[in-house]
Amino acid sequence: MHGHRAPGGAGPSEPEHPATNPPGAAPPACADSDPGASEPGLLARRGSGSALGGPLDPQFVGPSDTSLGAAPGHRVLPCGPSPQHHRALRFSYHLEGSQPRPGLHQGNRILVKSLSLDPGQSLEPHPEGPQRLRSDPGPPTETPSQRPSPLKRAPGPKPQVPPKPSYLQMPRMPPPLEPIPPPPSRPLPADPRVAKGLAPRAEASPSSAAVSSLIEKFEREPVIVASDRPVPGPSPGPPEPVMLPQPTSQPPVPQLPEGEASRCLFLLAPGPRDGEKVPNRDSGIDSISSPSNSEETCFVSDDGPPSHSLCPGPPALASVPVALADPHRPGSQEVDSDLEEEDDEEEEEEKDREIPVPLMERQESVELTVQQKVFHIANELLQTEKAYVSRLHLLDQVFCARLLEEARNRSSFPADVVHGIFSNICSIYCFHQQFLLPELEKRMEEWDRYPRIGDILQKLAPFLKMYGEYVKNFDRAVELVNTWTERSTQFKVIIHEVQKEEACGNLTLQHHMLEPVQRIPRYELLLKDYLLKLPHGSPDSKDAQKSLELIATAAEHSNAAIRKMERMHKLLKVYELLGGEEDIVSPTKELIKEGHILKLSAKNGTTQDRYLILFNDRLLYCVPRLRLLGQKFSVRARIDVDGMELKESSNLNLPRTFLVSGKQRSLELQARTEEEKKDWVQAINSTLLKHEQTLETFKLLNSTNREDEDTPPNSPNVDLGKRAPTPIREKEVTMCMRCQEPFNSITKRRHHCKACGHVVCGKCSEFRARLVYDNNRSNRVCTDCYVALHGVPGSSPACSQHTPQRRRSILEKQASVAAENSVICSFLHYMEKGGKGWHKAWFVVPENEPLVLYIYGAPQDVKAQRSLPLIGFEVGPPEAGERPDRRHVFKITQSHLSWYFSPETEELQRRWMAVLGRAGRGDTFCPGPTLSEDREMEEAPVAALGATAEPPESPQTRDKT
């Protein structure tokens, strides 16, 4: 409990009646000096707080401890003899238990180790008293009669800590001015260990932060011995003089004047400034961003030199060495006056710097700055041109000259190698050294009269196109340097000798060879910057813009040369891939795409691995061949882009297929993935489009040729023999496509007509004719094609068969034509009721006859085996007693007639059931059944209509859903 100050504030009032302290509160201090108060007992290290650290309660503060936490207006009870000076030591301890005090309630007591007697005075031993650890809660209350048994400890006084040597007590130099980082958003929490042992108190004064920082300083750094002078704590009002009770043997501590006390309080605990945070007063610790070194605290010493006061506060105060004002010490006023004079001088200098410049002067300086920027860019162009010419001189007159001399005199390596490395570097060097650089130097000398460079660049920029040849040859030149450096020792020696010279700048030959490649883009960047800095309406703007366009054209010319060289490298790789068989290295030829692909055989439809190489003018069809040096390819066919057509395959059973038809040959190709097919189709289409645009540009495509190109190859208007036909696979035909006789492997073998691509028998292909697309070589053709090419033969055994005009059967409907315009078509396995086995056939429902089902032996047959009217048939799954031996089986029934069908997939089964069900009801057809119709057909069979209708003679109109 705190004692209250007397109304007069001069002397201490009577002590309050003893009472039990509330939980967590500190016990009352002793009323008078106790010889055992300074005796060391069982000590416990305190987490935070000591004589100079953390806010201390008034009852634990000695007579001279007002500056350490005793707020004005509180009574401070003495606890023994009070010295004038205290020694600040590194340690702080807690001591509990001592002799009971008469008249006061005995509780826990704290012995502060950092408060001691004079430097030469030693601690006197005191009799042992009962002691216990601070952490031991002990009994809740104690009476004077209750006294715990004393603990045993070693006899003898506690050793005194020796003072610090004088050379270690020198004041430290202030740290340099540095901005203090911003504090955290909220203060740090108080130490819970301190809250347990300290009594509840009012709001701590700002000086508690400085005291707490002293504790941290003593715990981290060596001991600094200094004398403390009482400093009153801050108060809301004007500071009042604090009267401390002093023993009769000691003189009273002199009080500071009001002004000096305020100055010390400001230095010890400054208030918050603008933009700063208030320190954490509860914990006695500043923000984590505030410096916590030893310079934060403030010391007052009577004997030693003035210490530096670097308290937390504004940087201007924290960085200047300050001595606390002492009215009895001379020189303090002089120090303050010197500091004030220096601050005044700095403020005057800053004001002089901030004198505003008149408006007219600022405008003139801005105009001069624009002119200077333009001049600097032009001067930069000149300086970089000088450095560039020196590099060209090094390449042409040093590297190239020495290598040519060695090649011509000693023949250590061919002279062609040197010419291949340096290309036209001699012409580039002459242009820059004799033309461009002198013009720029002359213009910069006359810059005051002619401040422009656009006219010079406009005149000489077209000559920069010569860089295209050098850039195109750069990769080959670097490769030659690397190759001959390893192959020829003398070549390597010359290169290394030149690279060691000072003019080379410790760079390799390859680095210097790269500079001409980078020079034109640098011209472009400098000229763009020059145009940006030119003032509006400058006379040089037009010439500079024109020069920029010419330089950009030269840069594009160089880039085009680079791209052309890259294309040439690709052509060379393909040339090596083909083993030199095909002459494809040409400036006009460009590689578009290459890669593996599957080719479908024209006879049996098997897949074969092939390699396609697409150029801008032709397609190479290659087959792989094995060699000792690796896999190479041989060209099997060459298809020109002129006249090439790309089609999608109509065969549903072969996914990812497409057809390439050209004048020389037609190929049916299959990709391994959908992405691969998409890439090939896109590449071929883009090539065809570019070729068409080229023909239109040069007006080489007339109207007649356009009709021939736009006409499908198999149409009757095509001139036979001028382009390769699309061959029909032999397995897709079961009969001769001319005489309609069925094939067999012995008497009726299959042959292909090289003019139309149809599959015919031997009797129908006895003629031979020269075909234009095959370089006028003789090929087997059918009778109809021979008649179209050469007219009716005079004596031909096959001619008599075609002379009489026979009546055409209703079944003579070509399957391929019907399939192209059909509602649905696919292979199905079928079996009639009572049949012995399943048969495979090609079924088609044509669009022009949607109520009739045609059955073909193969997709390319010219005549159907039979036809089946669908009206009146009911579609449904097989009955429970019928156990077909195939999957996805459904049947159509009418009266006593039943047909069983088995598609390959379940999706195909749903589509066929939907189409046949609608045809059985006599409905018209849409291109394909909807998903809802498929589900309805899957869930329940469709009831057939009893009415019948005649087959329509004209094509039916389909419903559009």
Swiss-Prot record:
<feature type="modified residue" description="Phosphothreonine">
    <location>
        <position position="711"/>
    </location>
</feature>
<dbReference type="GO" id="GO:0007165">
    <property type="term" value="P:signal transduction"/>
</dbReference>
<feature type="domain" description="DH">
    <location>
        <begin position="373"/>
        <end position="561"/>
    </location>
</feature>
<dbReference type="GO" id="GO:0043087">
    <property type="term" value="P:regulation of GTPase activity"/>
</dbReference>
<feature type="binding site">
    <location>
        <position position="764"/>
    </location>
    <ligand>
        <name>Zn(2+) 1</name>
    </ligand>
</feature>
<feature type="compositionally biased region" description="Basic and acidic residues">
    <location>
        <begin position="273"/>
        <end position="284"/>
    </location>
</feature>
<feature type="compositionally biased region" description="Low complexity">
    <location>
        <begin position="316"/>
        <end position="325"/>
    </location>
</feature>
<dbReference type="InterPro" id="IPR035899">
    <property type="entry name" value="DBL_dom_sf"/>
</dbReference>
<feature type="compositionally biased region" description="Acidic residues">
    <location>
        <begin position="335"/>
        <end position="351"/>
    </location>
</feature>
<comment type="function">
    <text>Activates CDC42, a member of the Ras-like family of Rho- and Rac proteins, by exchanging bound GDP for free GTP. Plays a role in regulating the actin cytoskeleton and cell shape.</text>
</comment>
<feature type="compositionally biased region" description="Basic and acidic residues">
    <location>
        <begin position="125"/>
        <end position="135"/>
    </location>
</feature>
<dbReference type="InterPro" id="IPR035941">
    <property type="entry name" value="FGD1-4_PH2"/>
</dbReference>
<keyword id="KW-0862">Zinc</keyword>
<feature type="binding site">
    <location>
        <position position="753"/>
    </location>
    <ligand>
        <name>Zn(2+) 2</name>
    </ligand>
</feature>
<dbReference type="GO" id="GO:0005856">
    <property type="term" value="C:cytoskeleton"/>
</dbReference>
<comment type="subunit">
    <text>Interacts with DBNL/ABP1 and CTTN. May interact with CCPG1. Binds CDC42.</text>
</comment>
<dbReference type="GO" id="GO:0005829">
    <property type="term" value="C:cytosol"/>
</dbReference>
<dbReference type="GO" id="GO:0009887">
    <property type="term" value="P:animal organ morphogenesis"/>
</dbReference>
<dbReference type="GO" id="GO:0005886">
    <property type="term" value="C:plasma membrane"/>
</dbReference>
<dbReference type="GO" id="GO:0046847">
    <property type="term" value="P:filopodium assembly"/>
</dbReference>
<feature type="binding site">
    <location>
        <position position="756"/>
    </location>
    <ligand>
        <name>Zn(2+) 2</name>
    </ligand>
</feature>
<feature type="modified residue" description="Phosphoserine">
    <location>
        <position position="205"/>
    </location>
</feature>
<dbReference type="GO" id="GO:0005794">
    <property type="term" value="C:Golgi apparatus"/>
</dbReference>
<dbReference type="GO" id="GO:0005737">
    <property type="term" value="C:cytoplasm"/>
</dbReference>
<dbReference type="Pfam" id="PF00169">
    <property type="entry name" value="PH"/>
</dbReference>
<feature type="domain" description="PH 1">
    <location>
        <begin position="590"/>
        <end position="689"/>
    </location>
</feature>
<feature type="region of interest" description="Disordered">
    <location>
        <begin position="925"/>
        <end position="961"/>
    </location>
</feature>
<feature type="compositionally biased region" description="Low complexity">
    <location>
        <begin position="27"/>
        <end position="38"/>
    </location>
</feature>
<keyword id="KW-0225">Disease variant</keyword>
<feature type="zinc finger region" description="FYVE-type">
    <location>
        <begin position="730"/>
        <end position="790"/>
    </location>
</feature>
<dbReference type="GO" id="GO:0008360">
    <property type="term" value="P:regulation of cell shape"/>
</dbReference>
<feature type="binding site">
    <location>
        <position position="761"/>
    </location>
    <ligand>
        <name>Zn(2+) 1</name>
    </ligand>
</feature>
<dbReference type="InterPro" id="IPR001849">
    <property type="entry name" value="PH_domain"/>
</dbReference>
<feature type="region of interest" description="Disordered">
    <location>
        <begin position="702"/>
        <end position="726"/>
    </location>
</feature>
<dbReference type="InterPro" id="IPR000219">
    <property type="entry name" value="DH_dom"/>
</dbReference>
<protein>
    <recommendedName>
        <fullName>FYVE, RhoGEF and PH domain-containing protein 1</fullName>
    </recommendedName>
</protein>
<keyword id="KW-0597">Phosphoprotein</keyword>
<dbReference type="InterPro" id="IPR035939">
    <property type="entry name" value="FGD1_PH1"/>
</dbReference>
<feature type="modified residue" description="Phosphoserine">
    <location>
        <position position="715"/>
    </location>
</feature>
<dbReference type="GO" id="GO:0030027">
    <property type="term" value="C:lamellipodium"/>
</dbReference>
<dbReference type="InterPro" id="IPR013083">
    <property type="entry name" value="Znf_RING/FYVE/PHD"/>
</dbReference>
<feature type="binding site">
    <location>
        <position position="782"/>
    </location>
    <ligand>
        <name>Zn(2+) 2</name>
    </ligand>
</feature>
